[in-house]
């Protein structure tokens, strides 16, 4: 009986670790039947993927971040979708799911928001890019293990 309980607990833990944000899953379900909806999901060791395509990653900082990515979800809404409304709905949904706003950069009603879930180590990063002029919404969800120091180094490399 103990083995059964232990096995079920381990199984539930693994499923919980691989769970996608409910807000992002709802967005994906809303548009999955639309032919113009783009969704790409990559799993496994992201660094091996990057090396296979000869993507140049700085071996000291960006490579560490890339190796930490276990799963990547990339979504873009189809043209004509109410992108600004979806952008606001997704923001509220992520906040309800206890994601913390890590960074915000905006110009007018367009902008980039980065949300993280976790305390010292983040298990999930969500990047929202919304453009009111173009009516676009791009969502990037990264699952893995990201430390604050690692993200600070990666940000320094981008500047």
Pin down the residues of each PLM region.
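Mid-chain, structured segments of secreted extracytoplasmic proteins
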Residues: 61-108
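Early exported N-terminus immediately downstream of N-terminal targeting peptides
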Residues: 24-81
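N-terminal V-set
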Residues: 111-113
């Amino acid at each position: 009986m103990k083995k059964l309980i232990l096995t079920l607990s381990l199984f539930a833990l693994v499923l919980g670790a691989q769970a996608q944000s409910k807000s992002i899953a709802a967005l994906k379900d809303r548009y999955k039947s639309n032919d113009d909806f783009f969704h790409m999901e990559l799993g496994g060791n992201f660094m091996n993927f990057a090396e296979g395509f000869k993507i140049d990653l700085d071996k000291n900082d960006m490579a560490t971040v890339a190796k930490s990515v276990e799963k990547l979800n990339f979504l873009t809404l189809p043209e004509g979708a109410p992108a600004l409304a979806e952008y606001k709905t997704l923001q509220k949904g992520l906040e309800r799911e206890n994601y913390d706003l890590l960074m915000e950069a905006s110009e007018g009603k367009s902008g980039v928001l980065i949300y993280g879930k976790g305390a010292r180590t983040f298990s999930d990063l969500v990047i929202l890019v919304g453009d009111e002029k173009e009516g676009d919404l791009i969502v990037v969800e990264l699952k893995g293990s990201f430390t604050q120091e690692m993200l600070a180094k990666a940000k320094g490399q981008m500047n």
